């Protein structure tokens, strides 16, 4: 299932909603083979099966879902910030170094910093340079970073 972001982080997959003769509906993922359901269906809608962080599952019509959500592998910088505010790590496909990501630090009573800040973690940096620094330091976005649509959630 692909991950998407809107006002909240959800998981979703393309699916059909079948209306059965008894008035009930059944949601079937596009890649599922359910000929017995298709044979009993009186109508079919195209859309998404959506799973929320608390496990709740629902159905969303295709147009409504695609207007509200964007896959987390092609986010704007603004959506990347929202993802960090929800506790996710983010990175850019356009960065030269692989294995690096950003996190948002929210200070607590033990922190020396008093306001939230973004930092970059380079501990997993994959590079041919044996002298490349590895660690975690505060980070500032460039104009290119802020205007890029290649941000993604790091799993």
Where are these regions (language model features)?
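Motif-centric detector for short Cys/His coordination patterns
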Residues: 1-97, 106-115, 141, 153-155
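Acidic, glycine/polar-enriched metal-coordinating patches/loops
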Residues: 113-147
């Amino acid at each position: 299932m692909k991950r998407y972001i809107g006002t909240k982080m959800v998981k979703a997959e393309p699916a059909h909603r079948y209306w059965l003769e008894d008035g009930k509906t059944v949601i079937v993922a596009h890649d599922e083979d359910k000929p017995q359901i298709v044979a009993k269906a009186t109508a079919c809608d195209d859309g998404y099966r959506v799973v929320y962080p608390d496990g709740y599952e629902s159905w969303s019509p295709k147009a409504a879902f695609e207007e509200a959500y964007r896959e987390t592998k092609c986010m704007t910088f603004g959506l990347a910030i929202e993802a960090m505010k929800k506790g996710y790590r983010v990175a850019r496909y356009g960065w030269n170094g692989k294995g690096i990501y950003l996190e948002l630090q929210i200070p607590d009573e033990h922190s020396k910093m008093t306001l939230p800040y973004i930092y970059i973690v380079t501990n997993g940096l994959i590079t041919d340079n044996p002298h490349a620094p590895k660690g975690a330091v505060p980070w500032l976005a460039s104009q290119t970073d802020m205007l890029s649509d290649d941000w993604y959630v790091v799993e």
